[in-house]
């Protein structure tokens, strides 16, 4: 995919490869201008990695681009069409409040989507106003950057700009636009959309484009579309295992929110688990617990089955044989997920080698944590540093019994105790974006226009494995509440 434009003073270096797909996949339009754009947070390090001049982005002209008031030379804004199963129900969807401005080609030749979220109505808006509120946009900025620092594949946030306009949800709220950066915004739902149009030519065009963009090493494969499915399964198995290992709950794992690239996308109702419980749900709209913490691997494979269904015409000319190929391929998700999860959990427990009983040891710890309502993140920190033993959980007979088995397990490997502790330090974060801390930062920013709380939180979250003293205050768990924490989509 060759780049088509010259580099501009700000560093914008655009290509529009997605716009070369069949026109059914998008609608071209310009972002709706806003009254009084103001930059409230810019990700300087991300800007630099994209080949952009951070200071130029802070200028009046730079902010105008981030707010959608100016379209840079070489950009060709478009809203993407896609479909999706939302809580199990199929719908034709699309970018209802976002525009892909263009694709930035970095100095190293990498390609990233630059998307404005909250940029106005599109042909896919349905009853929405196409705008976004400041709180949810800042929330996505905080959590996506925390996920990046944790080493979890994710879309990223370049900037949040206020619009000088109000939007109306339950109440009047300040409007904002998030500049999101992604390897691409191709989703499982994009393939569902292509399949729903019943155009094999369009489906093939999308698959070929996706392979060229994300998996060029399989272009010459004997069965490239099967290889594409296998690649996505592998990436999603790895991604969801990483979610589970840090206690991340996505909250809205619809098929339109599962990327082909393997990046986490859409941070609307997500949250991190405090007390360990597999049935934990934070999303206010997930009334049945479909997307609960413990369900995420199962929803992942369900979503991937929908991708496989969409690809059937490309897998084999005989539909029954295609279905069998898809089924055999999807069945590999479970073992792949378990492989990644076990490897990650071994690292969290300081274990270097493999033993057949490792899974049993891990599940015994988790079951004891659930019984005593132990904090997920802090339990692993306590094991890492041998601290915080004065609680019912650590005093319990069940934990004492497990701890003895764990020490015996560590003794059966060649690596030293200090090596095990270093492995644990490198895999057990000192800090996660705890819900009450995120809410504190958002309240100060939205209600008081005070961004200092958020800036301190972002600084602490930027190096979660540093285990520095300034991170300790963020390790405290929230006070017990009669009202469970709830998250909202922000739409």
Swiss-Prot record:
Named cofactor requirement(s): Mg(2+); Mn(2+)
GO function terms (MF aspect): AMPylase activity; ATP binding; magnesium ion binding
The EC number(s) this enzyme carries: 2.7.7.-, 2.7.7.108
Binding site for Mg(2+): 257, 266
Catalytic activity field: L-seryl-[protein] + ATP = 3-O-(5'-adenylyl)-L-seryl-[protein] + diphosphate; L-threonyl-[protein] + ATP = 3-O-(5'-adenylyl)-L-threonyl-[protein] + diphosphate; L-tyrosyl-[protein] + ATP = O-(5'-adenylyl)-L-tyrosyl-[protein] + diphosphate; L-histidyl-[protein] + UTP = N(tele)-(5'-uridylyl)-L-histidyl-[protein] + diphosphate
Annotated residues for binding of ATP: 94, 96-97, 117, 129-130, 180, 187, 266
Residues at the active site: 256 (proton acceptor)
Function comment: Nucleotidyltransferase involved in the post-translational modification of proteins. It can catalyze the addition of adenosine monophosphate (AMP) or uridine monophosphate (UMP) to a protein, resulting in modifications known as AMPylation and UMPylation.
Family according to the record: Belongs to the SELO family.
Listed name of the protein: Protein nucleotidyltransferase YdiU
């Amino acid at each position: 995919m060759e780049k088509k434009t010259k580099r501009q003073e700000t560093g914008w270096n655009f290509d529009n490869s997605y716009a070369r797909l069949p026109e059914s996949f998008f609608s071209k339009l310009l972002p709706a201008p806003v009254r009084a754009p103001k930059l409230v947070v810019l990700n300087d390090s991300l800007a630099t990695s994209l080949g952009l001049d951070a200071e130029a982005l802070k200028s009046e002209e730079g902010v105008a681009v981030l707010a959608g008031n100016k379209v840079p030379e070489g950009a060709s804004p478009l809203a993407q069409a896609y479909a999706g199963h939302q809580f199990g129900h199929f719908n034709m969807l699309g970018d209802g409040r976002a525009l892909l401005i263009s694709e930035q080609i970095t100095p190293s030749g990498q390609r990233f989507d630059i998307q404005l979220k909250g940029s106005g109505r599109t042909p896919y808006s349905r009853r929405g106003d196409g705008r976004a509120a400041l709180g949810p946009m800042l929330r996505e900025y905080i959590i996506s950057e925390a996920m990046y620092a944790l080493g979890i594949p994710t879309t990223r946030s370049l900037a949040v700009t206020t619009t000088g306009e109000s939007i109306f949800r339950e109440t009047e709220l300040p409007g904002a636009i998030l500049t999101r950066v992604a390897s691409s915004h191709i989703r499982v739902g994009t393939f569902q959309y292509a399949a729903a149009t019943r155009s094999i030519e369009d489906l093939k065009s999308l698959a070929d484009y996706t392979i060229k963009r994300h998996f060029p090493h399989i272009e010459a494969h004997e069965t490239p579309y099967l290889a594409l499915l296998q690649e996505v399964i592998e990436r999603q198995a790895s991604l969801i295992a990483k979610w589970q290992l840090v206690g991340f709950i996505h909250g809205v794992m619809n098929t339109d929110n599962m990327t082909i690239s393997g990046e986490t996308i859409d941070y609307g109702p997500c949250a991190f688990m405090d007390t360990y419980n597999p049935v934990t749900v934070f999303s206010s709209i997930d009334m049945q617990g479909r997307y609960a913490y413990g369900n995420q691997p199962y929803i992942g494979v369900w979503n991937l089955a929908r991708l496989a269904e969409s690809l059937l015409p490309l897998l084999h000319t005989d539909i029954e044989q295609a279905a069998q190929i898809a089924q055999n391929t999807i069945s590999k998700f479970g073992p792949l997920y378990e492989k990644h999860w076990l490897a990650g959990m071994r690292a969290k427990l300081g274990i270097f080698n493999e033993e057949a009983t490792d899974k049993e040891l891990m599940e015994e710890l988790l079951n004891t944590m659930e019984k005593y309502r132990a904090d997920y993140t802090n339990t692993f920190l306590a094991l890492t540093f041998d601290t915080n033993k004065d609680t019912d959980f650590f005093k319990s007979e069940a934990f004492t019994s497990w701890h003895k088995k764990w020490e015996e397990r560590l003794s059966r490997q060649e690596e030293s105790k200090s090596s095990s502790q270093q492995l644990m330090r490198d895999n057990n974060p000192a800090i996660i974006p705890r819900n009450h801390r995120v809410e504190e930062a958002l309240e100060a920013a939205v209600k008081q226009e005070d961004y200092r709380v958020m800036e301190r939180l972002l600084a602490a979250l930027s190096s979660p494995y540093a285990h520095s003293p300034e991170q300790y205050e963020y390790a405290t768990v929230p006070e017990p509440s009669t009202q469970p924490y709830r998250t909202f989509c922000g739409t």
